[in-house]
Amino acid sequence: MAWFLCMCVFSVVGLGLLLLQVKLRRSLETRGGPPSLPVFPLIGSLLSLRSNQAPHVLFQKLQQKYGHTYSLMMGPHTVILVNHHQHAKEVLLKKGKIFAGRPRTVTTDLLTRDGKDIAFADYGATWRFHRKTVHGALCMFGEGSASIEKIICREALSLCDTLRESGSASLDLSPELTRAVTNVVCSLCFSSSYCRGDPEFEAMLQFSQGIVDTVAKDSLVDIFPWLQVFPNADLRLLKQCVSIRDKLLQKKYEEHKSDYSDHEQRDLLDALLRAKRSAENNNTAEITMETVGLSEDHLLMTVGDIFGAGVETTSTVLKWAIAYLIHHPQVQQRIQEELDSVVGGDRTPQLSDRGSLPYLEATIREVLRIRPVAPLLIPHVAQTDTSIGKFTVRKGARIIINLWSLHHDEKEWKNPEMFDPGRFLNEEGTGLCIPSPSYLPFGAGVRVCLGEALAKMEIFLFLSWILQRLTMTVSPGQPLPSLEGKFGVVLQPVKYKVNATPRAGWEKSHLQTS
């Protein structure tokens, strides 16, 4: 009986505290905070988020009632949704460092060994050092590097040959694109690549998809961490996938350690090893293991970050691009005519051709607009009390930029659901333009995508090589690829099959990489 009375007292007190918290949260709006969705004890605004629509679409729809910027409660957490480019740029650019924090969640902590990576790590000295180190390595081996262009072209040739050899059979494009992009990133990170059917590559595909599927579910355990004491199939699967990934990363790490040389940097992992050794051997106050945090965990998670993000995002953009080209054969034909005119059939496309292929570049930009690979950017956290526009924002509030809303704003884009590469061309159709400031496909500011330049290189070269040699269609009587998308860590197209028909003169692969 006494136990029951104690439970009742604790329940009443707890409920009272929660009601007080809700009252205080609601009062934020009257003190200058953004308009808020309804808030209830314990669950916050979750009842308002029940919908069959994907989150980015629902958040876009809710702005009709609450305005471009509004707030909600995810359990005990204040979340502010930003759906307009002016406020988005204030968060990302004008006040980038103030909003550079990251929230801690159960799933991302499992994925990153408690935030020891770049994408999900909180802002601070350790994060800045890691990002600077990785950016330097990417500049050395990636952006503008002739060696990385050669690697991409090698994989583009292999991909085109695989597609050509499929003959009249329909082919699932997803694993082939993923392997091609994986090999580019593996060459950059590990100086290695994979052949079709390689067991290690197949394991990589499996754990990557498992991570994407589980992290994407916005599990209740991330809102209420105490739920992890109960059996959870998603968490169990995530742990299994992370374990497989970590074994692969550890294997690559040990291989690099065994033959590492200070006189040669072969790849990104070598660059990180050099930075780690410098930190271990440097006794100055400016650089120590404590200040930069370059432990083995940090090193492995940083590489894992680049590997995971670099493969999933770029391959997804390529899948969307080909899906839209199948839907719009006139766009595909115009790109091919542009390639024929500028590149011809006696050589392969090169990065130096980008400025001379405006319609292809415009098409890539339109794909990134209409189907942003990350429709909701990774949440930011306010590190101090601040503001967004006229709205007060309290320290610790989570900010989500709805890139989907920015890219589908009817006031910024004419017929935003229409696929129209021409919107990115000047009036003469001879040069590129950005017709609206509401366009941020790679984010912006302090947390801008590290691999933006590399991704643009890959997308351009893979598409130009494919379209120079092949025409992409579906078999007669087969449905066109769905353009709805599957929401997750990235917005993936539903799997589809293609027919890759060699263009005239390209029945055999007569041009190789130089």
UniProtKB/Swiss-Prot annotation:
GO BP, one annotated term: progesterone metabolic process
Swiss-Prot/TrEMBL keywords: Heme, Iron, Lipid metabolism, Lyase, Membrane, Metal-binding, Monooxygenase, Oxidoreductase, Steroidogenesis
Superkingdom of source: Eukaryota
Pfam families given in the database record: p450
Pathway the protein takes part in: Lipid metabolism; steroid biosynthesis
Enzyme Commission number(s): 1.14.14.19, 1.14.14.32
Subcellular location(s) per record: Membrane
Activity regulation, free text: Regulated predominantly by intracellular cAMP levels.
Catalytic activity field: a C21-steroid + reduced [NADPH--hemoprotein reductase] + O2 = a 17alpha-hydroxy-C21-steroid + oxidized [NADPH--hemoprotein reductase] + H2O + H(+); 17alpha-hydroxyprogesterone + reduced [NADPH--hemoprotein reductase] + O2 = androst-4-ene-3,17-dione + acetate + oxidized [NADPH--hemoprotein reductase] + H2O + 2 H(+); 17alpha-hydroxypregnenolone + reduced [NADPH--hemoprotein reductase] + O2 = 3beta-hydroxyandrost-5-en-17-one + acetate + oxidized [NADPH--hemoprotein reductase] + H2O + 2 H(+)
GO CC, alphabetical: membrane
InterPro entries named among the record's database cross-references: Cyt_P450 (IPR001128), Cyt_P450_CS (IPR017972), Cyt_P450_E_grp-I (IPR002401), Cyt_P450_sf (IPR036396)
GO molecular function terms listed in the Swiss-Prot or TrEMBL record: heme binding; iron ion binding; lyase activity; steroid 17-alpha-monooxygenase activity
CC cofactor: heme
Residues noted as binding heme in the record, renumbered to the chain: 449
Gene3D superfamilies: Cytochrome P450 (1.10.630.10)
Family of the protein in this entry: Belongs to the cytochrome P450 family.
Record function comment: Conversion of pregnenolone and progesterone to their 17-alpha-hydroxylated products and subsequently to dehydroepiandrosterone (DHEA) and androstenedione. Catalyzes both the 17-alpha-hydroxylation and the 17,20-lyase reaction.
Protein's UniProt name: Steroid 17-alpha-hydroxylase/17,20 lyase
Originating species: Oncorhynchus mykiss (Rainbow trout)
Encoding gene (name): cyp17a1
